[in-house]
Amino acid sequence: MFKCPERVSIKKKEDILDLPNLVEVQIKSYKQFLQIGKLAEERENIGLEEVFREIFPIKSYNEATILEYLSYNLGVPKYSPEECIRRGITYSVTLKVRFRLTDETGIKEEEVYMGTIPIMTDKGTFIINGAERVVVSQVHRSPGINFEQEKHSKGNVLFSFRIIPYRGSWLEASFDINDLIYIHIDRKKRRRKILAMTFIRALGYSTDADIIEEFFAVEEHSLRSEKDFVALVGKVLADNVVDADSSLVYGKAGEKLSTAMLKRILDAGVQSLKIAVGADENHPIIKMLAKDPTDSYEAALKDFYRRLRPGEPATLANARSTIMRLFFDSKRYNLGRVGRYKLNKKLGFPLDDETLSQVTLRKEDVIGALKYLIRLRMGDEKTSIDDIDHLANRRVRSVGELIQNHCRSGLARMEKIVRERMNLFDFSSDTLTPGKIISAKGLVSVLKDFFSRSQLSQFMDQTNPVAELTHKRRLSALGPGGLNRERAGFEVRDVHSSHYGRICPIETPEGPNIGLITSLSSFAKINEFGFIETPYRVVRDGIVTDEIEYMTADVEEDCVIAQASAELDEYNMFKDSVCWARYKGEAFEADTSTVTHMDVSPKQLVSVVTGLIPFLEHDDANRALMGSNMQRQAVPLLKTEAAIVGTGLEGRAAKDSGAIVVAQEDGVVEYVDSYEIVVAKKNNPTLKDTYPLKKFLRSNSGTCINQTPLCSVGDVVTHGDVLADGPATDKGELALGKNVLVAFMPWYGYNFEDAIIISEKLIKQDAYTSIYIEEFELTARDTKLGKEEITRDIPNVSEEVLANLGEDGIVRIGAEVKPGDILVGKITPKSETELAPEERLLRAIFGEKAADVKDASLTVPPGTEGVVMDVKVFSRKDRLSKSDDELVEEAVHLKDLQKEYKSQLAQLKMEHREKLGALLLNEKAPAAIIHRRSADILVQEGAVFDQETIELLERESLVDLLMAPCDMYDVLKDILSNYETAVQRLEVNYKTEAEHIKEGDADLDHGVIRQVKVYVASKRKLQVGDKMAGRHGNKGVVSKIVPEADMPFLANGETVQMILNPLGVPSRMNLGQVLETHLGYAAKTAGIYVKTPVFEGFPESRIWDMMIEQGLPEDGKSYLFDGKTGERFDSKVVVGYIYMLKLSHLIADKIHARSIGPYSLVTQQPLGGKAQMGGQRFGEMEVWALEAYGVAHMLQEILTVKSDDVSGRTRIYESIVKGENLLRSGTPESFNVLIKEMQGLGLDVRPMVVDA
């Protein structure tokens, strides 16, 4: 069996932590959303379950009818993912929901079909209408509370806060220039500001005394004589001072005490006063109390309502329901667990599960936020403003959450329909059941819309395995509820210190999306709140332990974190007394005794793709960015070859991308061919795992997916071993390009501007040859004029052209085709009205059949050549047009199918009985087993299981059994659940097969009788104009393919395979390519593979030592000889092995020519672009160039007859046919368009004859 090449490394010890599963982000999120495989009562209140519980129960307006949700049940997929791609359909399961309806007639329960839900493949993708798609995770501003500051034009700093819910109205509060706090509700309505004091009263703090008590500590002071005045003058009252007998008010809460006031109070016989500690007349709360126009709860509510809804009558009931709806109704306002967590953390409230489940706003939250805001204004050191670009304030919405939000809106639509149907239902004529009032359309259409149209549901980039993997790990700040690329500023796009180990600082696209689309770092995970976590080793008492702690960005702020490269002694203690560390996002030299944590690996900073670049630490960041992005564009080659110089991540990237086949369990290989591998399990050799291999499938980007086995019969395999290679992999390692012998030197000017010169030897060896597969599709429909027909009998086509078509009119597999060749012959009925009267007469006389159909065949488009490698035909069977023989044959097939189904079902039952027997027979029941519905005790606690009891359990379904939690119940649950799923799958397969025998391919689109798909494979060799690149952002275009004899050669006669321009290195500052060249040469000569992980790679000295060991020049430079003259070049040249990739920008796809073609309807000018068979625009600047030369006739020809002079075009055609050399140009059509536009503006422009 092939093993991955053992790579040599200078790394002293391996990483303490292995990389997590790289597509876990997708799989885990969707698993939580659907909770497949869990019993209804075991499901947690998350995902789809949460949405149903939120929307239901639905009550009618009079509350006489109630519809409750009980549970949902997911079916099994009808076809495999590969079959769905082949048929062009969605990989999904049925969703059935059990409802309970209570009305005046009684209680009814029913399971209602609610449509289908797309499910994720085990690679983390969805198949929608036959195309693989990925739902990208979205980074958005976290719900919660944010404190901000802005500078006023007068120079004052104004503080504010914002409470952002997950769903609902935003609540903002900000200081104004007079130190008063105003509340804004919803940003769109900024002008409607409400004084914070009014809002506090509207929340239920009615009197001034209540409000003061909330914000200040209250002390009681005695007032016996005038001696006490000194301590009290200037203090603020916390409560009204009232004469008990006459109810006369001597002082109001919030008033400042003066000597006169104190004298009056003393005279009235009041003996004690309540004083607000720390309050003075400049305190914002005291200022607002004075400013507040309201003085009671009712008045405040009405004032609040008036400002929010000016012009509407402000009644108490209206006002109360408005404020309740805005912030205290969980259907309209929801902070979410995340929002509640962030808010409680910031304001110092408890973080236990009970408080986190409180999703609406509380009065305490508003008071707490205002207190914090005032402390911030007063300059309290314990308060701080928030940085909105910090990852503590940005969270990730993964697939599950995005789909959950869409399901919520779909079910909310359905809720309205259900309510209306409840009200309009006529109980006298019919009985009401859940199925009659529930419409599944809302949910289905919302899901369909999300998967096919959402900005975050993207067609998967499948150029190579790395592109696939990166796409699933991508984070986007765009999309609904996110940012807009036009409005996103520099700060959002920039690298932030909190990104360390969470978001890769390098991998992001160039162009308008820079910084908005990023990638998860290699070790990063997403926690339950959606925040990105990264792992660190815990340091205790100066000892670096092997304990791993995953930390979010806000927790990390309080830790001192050492780098992974810090040296440790044999006791895992720091060797030096100081080391480089990070604290609050700043790097500094820290005393090792203060260090609390340590990085797990130097590569935790970067993403997987960036981690595949060797000597990344020697490359400029801009070039590393290009290198990361270009690896994703590398085309899988016909002959793959692993890189000599790797980073050690190649195997892991290939495994997690799903490109290769990996053993799921230990076992022995029993059978191998190019289509499947069968492995007998180690613990039970009678059970076998079958691994089907993908053969010559077309990827989303047209490249070829092909898996080849690496194992042989009899090989012993363990879990995780590579069984088969896939596209762009070599022995289980990623292999995107080729190791090529390169020289950095100029060569006759051909490598000017980064161009690349290659040897013809690479072409002969098929080194950079790749296979592309094109899919062409043709459908025959039932039209108004009759059925379209797929046939070989096409009117007015010679037999020569039809040579490659079979009898059924479809091209034979293996035929070589070129542009214009017919792939599938099709004729379409033609409308009678198209005929001229004389033609109709001729047809009536001669009865010509060919004239009533037109040729609508599928032909090869321009620019495509290749070999037909596969043909797929899907057709519907018409029940009525079947002959007797066909009906008999169908019956025989169905009988055989039923027989096969029954035998497989019997086999399943037998295996199920054996498993139950192995688990239970003669064992004691650790707990009683009870029937859930009838409440009968099936097995008593302590009873011994006999064969009869086992048979009894065998007949029951898992849903109906109840048992106290124990190990036996867990295994029993697994056995019953697996059996039920297997039976369900068998049943679906049987029904699908039977349907296929009776009706053919019933899932074809409406009106389609037959569908043919033809796959054409073309072999693309490397040619001049193709784009190539290394892994360091060193890209270029092939400028010349030189005969091997003319290439420069080394002293030993070996010719160089590729020449690169040395001027491409100094200004680009990507020295990694030079180091890779040297190390590659040394490793190739030694016959070894090396790995140089990012930030801990081979030092220069070690490379020179290896060069000397292999007898290579120690400076890495060699003398080369000119292949043309045989003379030695003057200077020494850097020669070595570098890993070069061929990118998917192939010249064959870009080159294009037009002789005749379509014209734009309005301007009558040729269209633009290859897809439209367009022309090359001769623009304004090109016209200037011709004007500069004074070539008037040429200019006139280009601007008229070659473009949009309609009549002139016809005339020039005639003159060419007649052989005349004549140009009579007319008016360009675009001139007429200009005149019409001016007339449209009311300017009467027309030619006029003026007498001279």
Swiss-Prot record:
It holds the Pfam family RNA_pol_Rpb2_3. Its EC number is 2.7.7.6. GO terms for molecular function: DNA binding; DNA-directed RNA polymerase activity; ribonucleoside binding. GO terms for biological process: DNA-templated transcription. NCBIfam families: PRK00405.1, rpoB. PANTHER family: DNA-DIRECTED RNA POLYMERASE I SUBUNIT 2. Belongs to the RNA polymerase beta chain family. This is DNA-directed RNA polymerase subunit beta. It comes from Chlamydia muridarum (strain MoPn / Nigg).
